[in-house]
Amino acid sequence: MIREERLLKVILAPHISEKSTVNAEKHNTVVFRVAIDATKAEIKAAVAKLFEVEVESVRTLVSKGKTKRTGGRTGRRSDWKKAYVTLAAGADIDFVGGAE
């Protein structure tokens, strides 16, 4: 069993983009930015507990940080992990939470 404290630290933010919006509409998939050391099992448990939905599958990828220049100095952005979470049929996560 994964501790609740760890589950709260796994999901950092939803990742909203054109691609993630199309995935949400066509394949019932939600995209999250997650902790770099998070496992698929932790991500699945965190989404199920925090949003009270049933998760079918989790796919992950690590996006490498870009090298950026500021004046004469070069720096590097941090690597980050993205998770594509496929929800069960009929399940939905509403990030906007607009008034009905």
UniProtKB/Swiss-Prot annotation:
Keywords associated with the record: Ribonucleoprotein, Ribosomal protein, RNA-binding, rRNA-binding
GO cellular component: cytosolic large ribosomal subunit
GO biological process: translation
A Pfam family this chain is assigned to: Ribosomal_L23
Source domain of life: Bacteria
Gene Ontology MF annotations: rRNA binding; structural constituent of ribosome
Gene3D superfamilies, per the entry: 3.30.70.330
PANTHER family per record: 60S RIBOSOMAL PROTEIN L23A
Oligomer and partners: Part of the 50S ribosomal subunit. Contacts protein L29, and trigger factor when it is bound to the ribosome.
Function summary: One of the early assembly proteins it binds 23S rRNA. One of the proteins that surrounds the polypeptide exit tunnel on the outside of the ribosome. Forms the main docking site for trigger factor binding to the ribosome.
Record-stated family: Belongs to the universal ribosomal protein uL23 family.
Protein's name according to its UniProt entry: Large ribosomal subunit protein uL23
